[in-house]
A protein has these predicted regions:
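Surface-exposed, glycine/proline- and aromatic-rich loop segments on solvent-exposed faces
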Residues: 49-113, 170-191, 196
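Long alpha-helical, hydrophobic tracts
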Residues: 22, 120-210, 435
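C-terminal segment of classical bacterial N-terminal signal peptides
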Residues: 15-25
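Accessory, solvent-exposed terminal regions and/or long lumenal/extracellular loops of proteins
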Residues: 26, 30-40, 181-422, 426, ...
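Short, compositionally biased low-complexity segments enriched in polar/charged residues
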Residues: 33-50, 135-147
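Loop/turn elements at helix/coil->beta-strand transitions in domains of secreted/extracellular proteins
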Residues: 56, 155-159, 429-430
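A cross-kingdom signal targeting lumenal/periplasmic-facing segments of multi-pass membrane
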Residues: 87-154, 335-342, 346-351
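Bacterial N-terminal signal peptides that target proteins for export
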Residues: 1-12
Length: 460
């Protein structure tokens, strides 16, 4: 049995997990050294959906780039939204969820194989068997078949709630009223109009934006009650020339969320890869994701993380505290909250968080031809934990004078080659390029593990 020594790396964020010695616990042990967060993707949108029963709190991160006066957001919603159901959320809350659930890189260091096994065993601390889950416009609207259901201001946003009889009239109304929507919106608006959905329309109030002191637009958060558990993404495809990335964080009191009208596939995980990837993790993850995306014919949602939010192992960021969970839209923590209230009042006693929030992180790369329908979600009671996790295993570089050390040394070339093959398969990178890079990572063991293999044997 191989024994491993684990140490902290300071590449990005270093968070201490639990020292793991028991083989049955190795699946989620190690130290976090890097993460593949949403910043890897230039056009990645992020959405939080907190869902319990038929109640949803939808938080939309605002990744708009350009002059704020040109900003317009049109979101189909299943019901008329009132002012008290809308708020602006702290921008940091999306970043916190992203950091907490991002795919991660962990590393291990082989211990000295010559250390007597019994002594190591006696000194090792067993890992737990299970982790604790620890006005004029209104007149023209009627002519166009558009009804203004509500009009109000929240934070830096002016918001209008619309219903429409036909998509052409809705498109005309939006353009006449100064909402700069892309050409071709009529075709994509039509299915939502036919299904009786309403439209949440927002633009920036420049005076209030300047008063706010913020440099960027804050996330909008909407609460509503509906049996429909969908995420309308088709409007985002109007001007898309390439595939777009969407990161969805679903928060539930029950367990994992899944998509019912598209397959959900776990992102490749728990792979041992060469140690040089530590300095190229962003490139690695982008290549690996694209390879898996093409392999699945570009029409699946990828599960990147699923976990009870009261714990993590290893932790890429600290779990969210109760106040942060509320900011993310979680409304069921306070047992005294009324079913009639879209959000729990902040004046109530702080809730006690146990295992009552489960996060599912889904990564969808979509195009109009492969994702013709909006994803439909459902909550499940499945609390199986999963994370995108990639393992670096550093070889022992000290002096080896025992039989176990010689056997360990003999096993390394095969291990390195397996890591190279795994990396090539995951990323579609050239195997020869991988081997050349690995030559620089073996360090003090030798200058070229495949070129000097026989010289290793000579010294045995």
């Amino acid at each position: 049995m191989k024994r491993f020594k684990i140490v902290i790396s300071s590449l990005l964020i270093t968070v201490l997990a639990v020292l793991c010695f028991a083989p049955t616990a190795w699946a989620f042990c190690g130290f976090y050294v890097a993460k593949a967060d949403s910043k890897l993707y230039n056009q990645a949108s992020q959405v939080i959906m907190a869902r319990d029963g038929d109640r949803t709190v939808l938080t939309m991160a605002n990744d708009f780039q350009g002059e704020v006066k040109d900003f317009a957001m049109v979101v189909p919603v299943p019901t008329v939204i009132k002012k008290e159901q809308v708020r602006v959320a702290p921008p940091k809350i999306v970043e916190r969820l992203d950091a907490f659930s991002a795919p991660r890189l962990v590393e291990y260091f082989d211990s000295d194989p010559c250390v007597e096994y019994d002594r190591v065993l006696n000194e090792a601390v067993p890992a737990p068997a299970a982790r604790a889950r620890a006005g004029a416009a209104r007149g023209s609207a009627s002519d166009l078949g558009v009804t203004v259901e509500a009009r109000f201001n929240v934070g830096e946003y002016d918001i209008v709630i619309l219903s429409a009889k036909e998509s052409g009239g809705l498109e005309t109304w939006l353009n006449r009223n100064g909402y700069k929507i892309p050409r071709g919106a009529k075709q994509l608006l039509q299915p939502y109009v036919r299904s009786g959905m309403k439209f949440f329309v927002a633009k920036v109030n420049l005076d209030k934006f300047e008063e706010s002191g913020y440099q960027f637009l804050r996330p909008l958060q909407i609460s509503y009650q509906s049996r429909k558990f969908i995420l309308p993404i088709r409007l985002g495809m109007i001007n898309a020339n390439a595939a777009q990335d969407l990161i969805v964080y679903v928060l539930s009191p029950k367990g994992q969320a899944e998509i019912t009208n598209y397959r959900t596939v776990k992102v490749p995980s728990d792979a041992n890869i060469p140690v040089f990837v530590k300095n190229e993790f962003s490139d690695f993850y982008k290549s690996m994701f694209q390879t898996a995306y093409l392999k699945e014919d570009r029409k699946v949602a990828f599960l990147e993380y699923a976990w009870d939010m009261s714990s993590c192992d290893p932790c890429s960021a600290e779990p969210l505290n109760p106040e942060e969970l509320k900011q993310a839209g979680v409304f069921w923590l306070d047992n005294n909250s009324s079913n009639d209230e879209p959000f729990p009042p902040s004046s109530r006693r702080p809730p006690i968080v146990s295992s009552s929030v489960f996060i599912t992180r889904l990564h969808i790369r979509y195009t109009r031809d492969k994702f013709p329908e909006d994803p439909i979600f459902q909550a499940t009671s499945n609390q199986e934990s999963f994370q995108g996790r990639y393992i670096l295993q550093h070889p022992f570089t000290g002096e080896l004078k025992c039989q176990a050390g010689r056997e360990y040394k003999r096993s390394l070339p095969k291990r390195f080659e397996q890591e190279a093959q795994t990396l090539a398969k995951l990323t579609n990178w050239n195997i020869q390029d991988i081997r050349r890079k690995m030559k620089l990572t073996v360090g003090d063991l030798n200058s070229s593990w495949w070129g000097n293999f026989f010289s290793w044997l000579v010294g045995m």
